[in-house]
Amino acid sequence: MNSMILGGCIPSPKKQTEPITVEKNPNMMYMLVGSYATPDEEGIKVYNFDEQTGNSQYISGIKGISNPSFLIPSADGKRIYTVGEDAGKSSTANAIKFDKEQKKLTLLNSQPTDGGAPCYITLSPSEKFVLTANYMGGSITVFPLDKDGKLKSETRLISFTGNSLDKERQTQPHLHCIKFTPDHKYLLASDLGTDQIHVFPVSENVTDGVSHSLLNESEEFNIKVESGSGPRHICFHPNQKFAYLINEISGKVIAFSYDKGKLNAIQYIE
C-alpha cells in the first residue's frame, strides 16, 4: 500500500462527511493522519491523496483511542499500529485493521505500554514485533504480535537512566524515536533527556512471540551527541551510508556516516 503518514495534528472541529469512493487513479495514495484527540473523536483519519494535484478526500476514521499521535502501517497496508499518548498508566499501543475494500478502520486490540507518553511506534523488520518509545516513561516497550496482527500482552520493557545539561527538559531520559537500521541489524533509540542514541544489536536468534528475544540488550552501546542537543528523530539516506538527527533543544541537525551500527558525526547544521 502506498501511504503517507501525518501525526500530531489537531482534530478538526467540523463533523466529517460519509466515506467517499473515488475513481481509481495511478497517482492516488492513502494518507493516514494521527492526532491528539479524545476517545470520542476520530483520532485517526484516512484520506485519498493525489500525488500529482495535492488534493485529498476524506475516506473514513476511527474513534476509541486517546491521543493517537503517531502511527505506522504494515507493509501490506492491512494493519495500522498507533500509540495512545497519555501521560501515565493509561498509555497504550493499538492495533487497527484497515479494510481497503470497505474503506473501514477497525480497532483489533490495545495493550498498555507500561511507560508514559509513548510518542513513536515502529514495526520490526520481520513485522512480528511492535515497539514504542515512551517519552515520559524513559523506556522502550516491545510487543510480540499474534498471527492476526494483534498485540500480545507478554511485553518487554527496557528502561534507561541519566540526565543532561538542560535543567528543565533533561532531568531524566526521554525516549523520542526508535528506528531500525537499513541493514536490519540494529535498533537506534534517540533519547532527548540524556543526549544519547542508544544502540541495540538485533538478535540472530529471535523467537516468535518472545519479546525479550528481539534485541541483544547486554550488547547495548551509546552514541553521545553535544550536551543540550535534545535528540528527537533520526532517518537514513536512501544509500544507507548516512543518517540525519534533528535535535529539539539546540535546533541543530547532525549528519552522520553509518557503518555496522556505528554513527560518526560529520556535520552539525545550525
Q: What are these regions, as identified by a protein language model?
A:
Residues 19-49:
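An edge-strand/N-cap motif at the start of beta-rich repeat modules
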Residues 36-38, 85-87, 135, 145, ...:
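Short loop/turn segments immediately following the C-termini of beta-strands
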Residues 48-54, 96-103, 143-152, 201-214, ...:
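Short loop/turn segments immediately following beta-strands, especially the blade-tip
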Residues 57-63, 106-111, 162-168, 218-224, ...:
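A short beta-strand motif characteristic of beta-propeller blades
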Residues 58-127:
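Blade-loop segments of beta-propeller domains
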Residues 1-24:
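Bacterial Sec-dependent N-terminal signal peptides
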Residues 40, 65-76, 114-125, 129, ...:
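Beta-rich, blade/repeat-based domains predominating
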